[in-house]
């Protein structure tokens, strides 16, 4: 796995078929999966994840797998999804075993910096469920501010 960039405790590598077993554990975790994959119905298969990896690589998506530096273990994925040329939406998914250890804050901060400094973005947006108070707090600590709220979602942004 080739490292693209790093932060204090995390190496950010391109998505790879090598991590499919780790991806499957994360996306098929019924207790935690609905927070980052809306409308989850059926368990994902290795073929589903292989297709996803291929699609990400073929489209040059800005998505990275996060690897814990000290152990080499998989933490989760973080991505910047297209909104426009200068605005992207950040998304993050962390395995249940690595939640609550500060990796979310570190990864969102690092990915926002990568987006603005390396990709030249002017604005990064995100959305989360209105009842995901822990995530909202983390995003605020990363410099994101709420700009819109609906019954189901909080929309936040970080502007250069």
Where are these regions (language model features)?
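Acetyl-CoA-dependent GNAT
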Residues: 39-91, 95-97, 150
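Conserved acetyl-CoA-binding loop-helix of GNAT-fold acetyltransferases
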Residues: 94, 100-114, 136-141
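Conserved G/P- and acidic residue-centered "switch" motifs that form tight phosphate/ATP-binding loops
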Residues: 72, 102, 132
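Amphipathic alpha-helical recognition patches that constitute DNA-binding helices
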Residues: 22, 89, 93, 134
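C-terminal "cap" of GNAT-fold acetyltransferases
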Residues: 122-133, 141-160
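A short, well-structured alpha-helix characteristic of acyl/acetyltransferase catalytic modules
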Residues: 1-46, 50
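A generic structured-segment signal
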Residues: 89, 104-116, 145-147, 155-157
């Amino acid at each position: 796995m080739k490292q693209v960039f790093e932060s204090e405790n995390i190496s950010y590598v391109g998505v790879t078929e090598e991590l499919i077993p780790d991806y499957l554990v994360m996306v098929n975790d019924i207790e935690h999966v609905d927070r980052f994959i809306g409308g989850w119905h059926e368990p994902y298969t290795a073929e589903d994840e292989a297709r996803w990896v291929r699609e990400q690589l073929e489209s040059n998506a800005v998505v990275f797998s996060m690897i814990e530096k000290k152990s080499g273990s998989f933490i989760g994925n973080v991505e910047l999804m297209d909104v426009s040329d200068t605005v992207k939406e950040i998304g993050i998914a962390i395995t249940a075993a690595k939640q609550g250890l500060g990796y979310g804050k570190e990864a969102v901060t690092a990915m926002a910096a990568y987006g603005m400094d390396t990709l030249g973005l002017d604005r990064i947006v995100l959305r989360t469920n209105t009842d995901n108070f822990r995530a909202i707090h983390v995003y605020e600590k990363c410099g994101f501010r709420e700009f819109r709220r609906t019954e189901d979602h909080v929309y936040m942004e970080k502007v250069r």
